[in-house]
């Protein structure tokens, strides 16, 4: 048994990096895009995993809020209007996406306080 090593290991089914990290977003594709995009000369192994996790979290957060907005409007399909309402009503997402225009999103309903009718007290 000289020079033979410890015996051949049988490799199981290939596991993607997204599976290993427990993510839905494609780690391999993000790694490729980071390398091709000339962001840096070299890209570490953990960078695409971290970026995929952040992107997945943000997408889930926006979809959760947009789904709630759709349900509030008694709709089963998320439309750009629901995305707009979800993002603009959330303080942190609004700050993050302040420079983004959503096509067909409309505007937030807002009436200035001075334009509202004055409440008068009735004396009994």
From Swiss-Prot:
Modified positions (Phosphoserine) in chain numbering: 2
Biological process terms in GO annotation: chromatin organization; heterochromatin formation; larval somatic muscle development; nucleosome assembly
One Gene Ontology MF term: structural constituent of chromatin
Region (Disordered): 1-21
Residues that bear N6-succinyllysine: 36
Maturation and modification: The chromatin-associated form, but not the free cytoplasmic form, is phosphorylated on Thr-120 by NHK-1 during mitosis, and dephosphorylated during S-phase. Also phosphorylated on Thr-120 by NHK-1 during prophase I of meiosis; which is required for acetylation of H3 'Lys-14' and H4 'Lys-5', diassembly of the synaptonemal complex, and karyosome formation.
Residue numbers carrying Phosphothreonine: 120
Protein name: Histone H2A
């Amino acid at each position: 048994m000289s020079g033979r090593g410890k015996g051949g290991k049988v490799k199981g089914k290939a596991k993607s990096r997204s599976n290993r990290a427990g993510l839905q977003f494609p780690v391999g594709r993000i790694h490729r895009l980071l390398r091709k995009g000339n962001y840096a000369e070299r890209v570490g192994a953990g960078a695409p995993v971290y970026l995929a996790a952040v992107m997945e979290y943000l997408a889930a957060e926006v979809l959760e809020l947009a789904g709630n907005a759709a349900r509030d409007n008694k709709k089963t399909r998320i439309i750009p209007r629901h995305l707009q309402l979800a993002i603009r009503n959330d303080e942190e997402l609004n700050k993050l996406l302040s420079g983004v225009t959503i096509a067909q999103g409309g505007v937030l309903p807002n009436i200035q306080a001075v334009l509202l009718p004055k409440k008068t007290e009735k004396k009994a």
